[in-house]
Amino acid sequence: MRLQMYINGEWVDAVTLEQREIINPYNREGIATVAEGSEEDAKRAVAAARHAFDEGTWARTPANERGEIVHEIGRLIRAHREELADLETLDTGKTVSESLDDMDDIANVFIYFAGLADKEGGELIESPLPDSTSKVVREPVGVCGQITPWNYPLLQAAWKLAPALAAGNTLVMKPSEITPLTTVKVFELFEQAGVPAGVANLVLGPGHTVGAHLSESTDVDLISFTGGIDTGKRIMQAASTNVKKIALELGGKNPNIIFADADFDVAVDQALNAAFFHAGQVCSAGARVIVERSMHEKFINALVDRAKNIKLGNGFAEDTQSGPLISAEHRNKVEKYVAIGQEEGATLALGGKRPETEALQQGFFYLPTIFTNCTSDMRIVQEEVFGPVLTVETFESAEDAVAKANDSIYGLAGAVFTEDIGKAESVAAKLRMGTVWINDFHPYFAQAPWGGYKQSGIGRELGRPGLEEYTETKHVFRNIKPDPLEWFK
């Protein structure tokens, strides 16, 4: 499989003709060769997007017509659901059942924003001045740079592509250089759906060249990035060149608060899913369990008993419950954090090593890992490991639980498990996080905004706020009967 970039309506190789091999993290086998773009390719793509916005018709196309094209993209994704899911599993190692669910969600995102495209027509505002009208309209921002991570390649791309197109923007997308396959395929579907040349451009390549140019270019009006906090900070600095609009989702260290009166079996099951789904490579992973002390020992025993039976393997095998980590480099990072946890005095209750099973030796697998006797000042509690590593703390009261949960630079998501709905709502109201789940973990949908407090990011994706990120607000005032002011006589 040999894949190119998509610039100004044409499939092209990199200017340098360089290529990158994409490997399957399950067995390290090569699955594709893709064009390896550079700053020059990014410049070409930005120029195409700039021309398409300034001189083209997309921004001025009736909103309902743009919505029809975005809806068609969603329909095509549904039609190619299985093909896309297979590519996603090859590229990321996740189970194909996860990938199929992702494709359903992705199609829904495009269809949702297609429906919103003509629902943001603005509003009339009563003018306090006589013989005048006043209205507020929303217009597209312009050229959008979009940079997506490797853990949910197409899902994260959809969260950016769909609202940007629905609002009338043009764009340059840069997916992670190690997981670009499904994004390339969807750009093929853009062509079929009728997206005009230059409106949506795709550049493949590393962040330090392609991503850096998108962040710095004065021809880019907005930069949207999902990824690590350090990279996000660099993007903020680079975007200051022309004071771009910025939308950042920078991950989290998400607390899962378990009260003693919670449904025990549900809480254990949800804690496992929160921590170990997709091998913990989820920005909203419930990597911090904060459990009421009176049930701590019982909860830990149940958690360990369940976690040690998680079946690792090939994402295409029906009995596989979790796949590998994305790369050797990332597994090394996870291993370093496990070593740090042990040095800090946490108790390793499970895992903490690579599996010994012969069939898993070629892949980047790591066993589900649980640390107990953790405190909130430990690095493994405070920093995003982004792997199958769960820390467990205890609390004495609701106030103690809230204080520990909020003791973080992050504020993306969190959960509360209790049968006392009053207590649940009270705790949820005090958590400084963009999403709080009660007696559940992980649900999200296109209609509800997603984003974080504190250093988890700026702005929102999904929901109406997700569309508004890609618009500018303009106030238009009209004097119906203008007279000379005669201020300066």
PLM region spans:
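Hydrophobic face of amphipathic alpha-helices that form TPR/SEL1-like repeat modules
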Residues: 1-26, 52, 353
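Residues at or immediately preceding the N-termini of alpha-helices
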Residues: 25, 39-42, 63, 81, ...
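Residue-level signal for inorganic ion chemistry
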Residues: 28, 66, 88, 110, ...
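Conserved C-terminal structural/oligomerization subdomain of aldehyde/semialdehyde dehydrogenase
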Residues: 29-33, 220, 311, 338, ...
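Glycine-rich loop-to-alpha-helix module at the N-terminal edge of alpha/beta enzyme cores
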Residues: 31-120
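Short, well-ordered beta-strand elements within core beta-sheets of diverse protein domains
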Residues: 31-37, 54-58, 146, 256-259, ...
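Rossmann-like NAD(P) dinucleotide-binding subdomain of oxidoreductase/dehydrogenase enzymes
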Residues: 122-266, 395
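ALDH superfamily catalytic-core signature
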Residues: 222, 230-375, 438, 485-488
